[in-house]
């Protein structure tokens, strides 16, 4: 290989091509590559921000769900307590009403017992008067002996 003028001319042409490429071709390519890198970086940053926002939104949703569950459980517990209180109150009222009915029935039975005893006393007094009348074979005046008959009733 001999070095002659064509090699120098080719070197100069290559150098001019390199300078032309560096001056006119390379800057738009570099600019396009930089813009592309910037877009990719912006896209990655937006994706990271969206991922962070999504995680924050999921966390807020979980917190709100937990709060809602707690409120629901609290409301259910309150409703159960109220229902239990209403049931207990109804039981107490029913028991009280039952006790009143039993007391009234007892009082009525006691009154009927007293009335029956009074009726029996009067019948016994009348029988005693008739028996005494038959024994004595004379008539006993109930109006005259009312005090005696009343004492006889109380003793019976």
UniProtKB/Swiss-Prot annotation:
<dbReference type="GO" id="GO:0046933">
    <property type="term" value="F:proton-transporting ATP synthase activity, rotational mechanism"/>
</dbReference>
<keyword id="KW-0406">Ion transport</keyword>
<keyword id="KW-0812">Transmembrane</keyword>
<keyword id="KW-0375">Hydrogen ion transport</keyword>
<dbReference type="InterPro" id="IPR005864">
    <property type="entry name" value="ATP_synth_F0_bsu_bac"/>
</dbReference>
<keyword id="KW-0997">Cell inner membrane</keyword>
<dbReference type="InterPro" id="IPR050059">
    <property type="entry name" value="ATP_synthase_B_chain"/>
</dbReference>
<keyword id="KW-0472">Membrane</keyword>
<dbReference type="GO" id="GO:0045259">
    <property type="term" value="C:proton-transporting ATP synthase complex"/>
</dbReference>
<keyword id="KW-0813">Transport</keyword>
<keyword id="KW-0138">CF(0)</keyword>
<keyword id="KW-0066">ATP synthesis</keyword>
<dbReference type="GO" id="GO:0005886">
    <property type="term" value="C:plasma membrane"/>
</dbReference>
<comment type="function">
    <text>Component of the F(0) channel, it forms part of the peripheral stalk, linking F(1) to F(0).</text>
</comment>
<feature type="transmembrane region" description="Helical">
    <location>
        <begin position="7"/>
        <end position="27"/>
    </location>
</feature>
<dbReference type="InterPro" id="IPR002146">
    <property type="entry name" value="ATP_synth_b/b'su_bac/chlpt"/>
</dbReference>
<comment type="similarity">
    <text>Belongs to the ATPase B chain family.</text>
</comment>
<protein>
    <recommendedName>
        <fullName>ATP synthase subunit b</fullName>
    </recommendedName>
</protein>
<keyword id="KW-1003">Cell membrane</keyword>
<dbReference type="GO" id="GO:0046961">
    <property type="term" value="F:proton-transporting ATPase activity, rotational mechanism"/>
</dbReference>
<dbReference type="Pfam" id="PF00430">
    <property type="entry name" value="ATP-synt_B"/>
</dbReference>
<comment type="function">
    <text>F(1)F(0) ATP synthase produces ATP from ADP in the presence of a proton or sodium gradient. F-type ATPases consist of two structural domains, F(1) containing the extramembraneous catalytic core and F(0) containing the membrane proton channel, linked together by a central stalk and a peripheral stalk. During catalysis, ATP synthesis in the catalytic domain of F(1) is coupled via a rotary mechanism of the central stalk subunits to proton translocation.</text>
</comment>
<keyword id="KW-1133">Transmembrane helix</keyword>
<comment type="subunit">
    <text>F-type ATPases have 2 components, F(1) - the catalytic core - and F(0) - the membrane proton channel. F(1) has five subunits: alpha(3), beta(3), gamma(1), delta(1), epsilon(1). F(0) has three main subunits: a(1), b(2) and c(10-14). The alpha and beta chains form an alternating ring which encloses part of the gamma chain. F(1) is attached to F(0) by a central stalk formed by the gamma and epsilon chains, while a peripheral stalk is formed by the delta and b chains.</text>
</comment>
<dbReference type="InterPro" id="IPR028987">
    <property type="entry name" value="ATP_synth_B-like_membr_sf"/>
</dbReference>
């Amino acid at each position: 290989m001999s070095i002659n003028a064509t090699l120098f001319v080719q070197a100069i042409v290559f150098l001019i091509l390199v300078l032309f490429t560096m001056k006119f071709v390379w800057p738009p390519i570099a600019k396009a590559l930089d813009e592309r890198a910037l877009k990719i970086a912006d896209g990655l940053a937006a994706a990271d921000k969206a991922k962070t926002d999504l995680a924050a939104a999921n966390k807020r949703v979980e917190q709100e769900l937990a709060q809602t569950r707690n409120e629901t459980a609290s409301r259910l517990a309150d409703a159960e307590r109220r229902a239990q209180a209403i049931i207990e109150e109804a039981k107490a009222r029913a028991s009280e009403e039952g006790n009143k009915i039993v007391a009234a029935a007892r009082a009525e039975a006691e009154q009927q017992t007293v009335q029956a005893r009074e009726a029996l006393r009067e019948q016994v007094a009348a029988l005693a008067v008739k028996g005494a009348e038959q024994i004595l074979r004379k008539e006993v005046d109930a109006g005259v002996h009312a005090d005696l008959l009343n004492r006889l009733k109380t003793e019976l």
